[in-house]
């Protein structure tokens, strides 16, 4: 498979490795992006790719809650200027409420739902976009539900650049729930518990860590013990219950919630633009600057 400049760019953004290292990794792995990431990590050149990679899009997230259901939405605009516009902020909140009322669980279903008599949510967004003067789109929707004896925690960071919702069972303590939602926004966990991590992902991580240890010259007979310790650290980075609580470093998040009589059920976190392509305009200039060195 031919390795393109766009592929090198994507790998560099995901790993922070140099362009030549990225190109070599892609050549060695026949253009397989995940395999190339693992290749760079095994060589000690790159860290694990963060969830969402680089962020390019503008917009806001918003939360709507009613009873035992909560909705988190992400709406994109073309510029940060519009994202700070009061009309856009009103639109985002209206969309979140409309999605909650519609019962939709996907962006596609939400857009097709009725917003008001004779008008779909998609039409409402298009009309407001014409007034605001930019393309505006509902990118994604997440719906969480809770039991009667559970509580929602919600948090919007930087006016909505990051939005999070958590469900905590066994308590009605909204302060605890909000604190955990703030932690989710700050620490960006990928999973609630270790049970949610797939066997495939665990096996891949063990392989990478094993190769790292062997490349460091560690004796094979102690590599297995090292891997066990490093896997625990890996879970502490990606699993909410195992992360060190940002508001009290004496606690892991799961233990903190348990100390308050609750148990973490689930969460969702949106960061505006995560996973979307970075704009292309500066890549050629960046390459030229590297070649001049």
Curated annotation (Swiss-Prot):
Gene3D superfamilies: 1.10.286.20, DNA helicase RuvA subunit, C-terminal domain (1.10.8.10), Elongation factor Ts, dimerisation domain (3.30.479.20)
Record PROSITE patterns: EF_TS_1, EF_TS_2
Superkingdom of origin organism: Bacteria
Region (Involved in Mg(2+) ion dislocation from EF-Tu) residue spans: 79-82
Pfam families: EF_TS
Location of the protein in the cell: Cytoplasm
Cystine crosslinks: none
Keywords assigned by UniProt, alphabetized: Cytoplasm, Elongation factor, Protein biosynthesis
InterPro entries referenced in this protein's UniProt entry, alphabetically: EF-Ts_dimer_sf (IPR036402), Transl_elong_EFTs/EF1B (IPR001816), Transl_elong_EFTs/EF1B_dimer (IPR014039), Transl_elong_Ts_CS (IPR018101), UBA-like_sf (IPR009060)
GO cellular component term of the entry, any: cytoplasm
Primary localization class, coarse: cytoplasm
A single GO molecular function term of this UniProt record: translation elongation factor activity
Similarity comment: family membership: Belongs to the EF-Ts family.
Role: Associates with the EF-Tu.GDP complex and induces the exchange of GDP to GTP. It remains bound to the aminoacyl-tRNA.EF-Tu.GTP complex up to the GTP hydrolysis stage on the ribosome.
Protein name listed in UniProt: Elongation factor Ts
Organism: Exiguobacterium sp. (strain ATCC BAA-1283 / AT1b)
Originating gene: tsf
